[in-house]
Swiss-Prot record:
The protein's name in its UniProt record: Nucleoid occlusion protein
Organism expressing this protein natively: Listeria welshimeri serovar 6b (strain ATCC 35897 / DSM 20650 / CCUG 15529 / CIP 8149 / NCTC 11857 / SLCC 5334 / V8)
Domain of life: Bacteria
PANTHER family tied to this protein: CHROMOSOME-PARTITIONING PROTEIN PARB-RELATED (PTHR33375), NUCLEOID OCCLUSION PROTEIN (PTHR33375:SF8)
Location, primary (coarse class): cytoplasm
CDD domains: SPO0J_N (cd16393)
Subcellular location: Cytoplasm, Nucleoid
């Protein structure tokens, strides 16, 4: 089966056609002979949903078989249906119905990615790693991959940029401690150490994206020259205070003169200071 066929599928029933193509029968395979998909993009499974599925299986059994491929004699890798496998495992059942398919690594990786994308269950980091895996496997561009999985090229590129973040930040996204927008905003910071430090601030203060972006602007602003901005208000404040002092003195002199006191008032200005001389005669 050509690898490109996998990327052209949009609907879930079409994906089912792929994994069931050439199916002869459903087998009951031992649970201890089955292991998870090495290309499974999902690393975080919702245990509540697994438990809910297990309760359904306990009552109705496994309605839809899992799909596997034989890796070694009597050892099988899951292609599709890992949640069903985990649910059956939690029930401690010995066997699970399965369909065996002969698919290569690239086809298995593509099916795992597309299945999860259709269900919209991947975290942004899981999705990014799946895209990276497929790009590494196939000599295709981001644009070609985007067309095949029904995404825009910019969406693929934005997801891949998340993989440039430190492991601690990626893990926080996986665990849903911060959002994808939080994570993308951290890319504006130059060093991993600064990114990790800000991650701690976000978690400690429960900042939303807007607050996080404001903090990033503060951090970036520290590196910019601010001497002129700091001294200008200071000079304005000093100039304003001097004018107030000068006006107060002049008003006082005027009041004294209005009361009949004869005095001389002289004002001189230098580069460094104002000089005021007031002469009051001892005798009238």
């Amino acid at each position: 089966m050509p690898f490109s066929r996998l990327f052209g599928k949009k609907e879930k029933n079409q994906m089912d056609d792929i994994v069931e193509e050439g199916v002869q029968r459903v087998l009951e395979l031992p649970m201890d002979k089955i292991f998870p998909n090495q290309f499974q993009p999902r690393t975080v499974f919702d245990q509540d949903k697994i438990d809910e599925l297990a309760r359904t299986i306990r009552i109705h059994g496994v309605i839809q078989p899992i799909v596997v491929r034989e890796m070694e004699p009597d050892y099988y890798e899951i292609i599709a249906g890992e949640r069903r496998f985990r649910a059956v495992l939690s029930l401690e059942l010995e066997k699970i119905p399965a369909i065996i398919q002969n698919l290569d690594d690239e086809e298995v990786a593509a099916i795992a990615l597309i299945e999860n994308l259709q269900r919209e269950e991947l975290t942004p980091i899981e999705e990014a790693k799946a895209y990276r895996s497929l790009l590494d496997m196939q000599d295709v561009t981001q644009e070609a991959l985007a067309q095949r999985v029904g995404k825009s090229q910019s969406a693929i590129a934005n997801k891949l940029r998340l993989l440039k973040l430190p492991e601690a930040v990626q893990q926080a996204v996986l665990n849903k401690q911060i959002s994808e927008r939080h994570a993308r905003s951290l890319l504006a910071l130059e060093t991993e150490a600064t990114q990790v430090d800000l991650l701690a601030e976000i978690e400690e203060n429960h900042w939303n994206v807007k607050q996080t972006e404001a903090r990033i602007q503060e951090i970036l602003g520290v590196k910019k020259p601010t001497t002129t901005k700091k001294t200008k208000p200071k000079r304005q404040a000093i100039s304003r205070d001097v004018r107030i002092a000068m006006n107060t003195i002049k008003q006082s002199v005027t009041m004294v003169k209005d009361n009949g006191m004869d005095l001389d008032f002289k004002e001189e200005e230098t580069d460094d200071f104002y000089q005021i001389t007031i002469q009051i005669p001892k005798k009238k």
